[in-house]
Amino acid sequence: MTKGTPSQGRHNKGSNHIVCRRCGRRAYHVRKKACAACGFGKSTKIKRFAWKWKKVTGKGNRLK
């Protein structure tokens, strides 16, 4: 095993994100101890943004 640039490519074996206890998505960062999807570990409020869901207008097919 050599050191330097060739060895840096071998640092991608582990996974940074595991399944979140609160939202169930694979977005809980192990080292930061916070969920990127719902904000668990960072705040008590669930992280919500309007742009995450498609806006539906009228009486047509509703997205679930």
UniProtKB/Swiss-Prot annotation:
Molecular function (Gene Ontology), one example: structural constituent of ribosome
Cofactor: Zn(2+)
UniProt GO BP: translation
GO-annotated cellular components: ribonucleoprotein complex; ribosome
Top-level taxonomic group: Archaea
Cofactor descriptive note: Binds 1 zinc ion per subunit.
Xref: SUPFAM superfamilies: Zn-binding ribosomal proteins
InterPro entries referenced in this protein's UniProt entry, alphabetically: Ribosomal_eL37, Ribosomal_eL37/eL43, Ribosomal_eL37_CS, Ribosomal_zn-bd
Alphabetical UniProt keywords: Metal-binding, Ribonucleoprotein, Ribosomal protein, RNA-binding, rRNA-binding, Zinc, Zinc-finger
Pfam families noted in UniProt: Ribosomal_L37e (PF01907)
Annotated residues for binding of Zn(2+): C20, C23, C35, C38
Zinc finger boundaries on the chain: C4-type: 20-38
Family classification: Belongs to the eukaryotic ribosomal protein eL37 family.
Free-text function comment from the UniProt entry: Binds to the 23S rRNA.
Protein name: Large ribosomal subunit protein eL37
Organism in which the protein naturally occurs: Methanococcus vannielii (strain ATCC 35089 / DSM 1224 / JCM 13029 / OCM 148 / SB)
Species lineage: Archaea, Methanobacteriati, Methanobacteriota, Methanomada group, Methanococci
Primary gene name: rpl37e
